[in-house]
C-alpha cells in the first residue's frame, strides 16, 4: 500500500533506504511540524518502494511518501 504524509511538515530523518525490507511498526522516516516530531511507521511487513523524499524537503498533507511491496 501507499503511505502518505499525515500532515504538512518538514522531512528531518530518513531511517531506511529504498528497497529495504521493513517490519510492521518499524519507523521509516520522521517529519517535523510545529516543533513536534512525527514518526512515520511501516503499516505492514514489506519492501519500501518509491522512497524519494530527502531530508530538508517540505511535504504537503496527503503527498505520497513511499509504498510497500510484498
Curated annotation (Swiss-Prot):
Annotated metabolic or biological route of this protein: Lipid metabolism; fatty acid biosynthesis
GO CC annotation terms, alphabetical: chloroplast
Keywords noted in UniProt: Biotin, Chloroplast, Fatty acid biosynthesis, Fatty acid metabolism, Lipid biosynthesis, Lipid metabolism, Plastid
N6-biotinyllysine carried by residues: 35
Location, primary (coarse class): plastid
Compartments where found: Plastid, Chloroplast
TM region(s), chain numbering: none
Example GO BP: fatty acid biosynthetic process
Keyword Plastid found: yes
Role: This protein is a component of the acetyl coenzyme A carboxylase complex; first, biotin carboxylase catalyzes the carboxylation of the carrier protein and then the transcarboxylase transfers the carboxyl group to form malonyl-CoA.
Name assigned to this protein: Biotin carboxyl carrier protein of acetyl-CoA carboxylase
UniProt organism field: Solanum lycopersicum (Tomato)
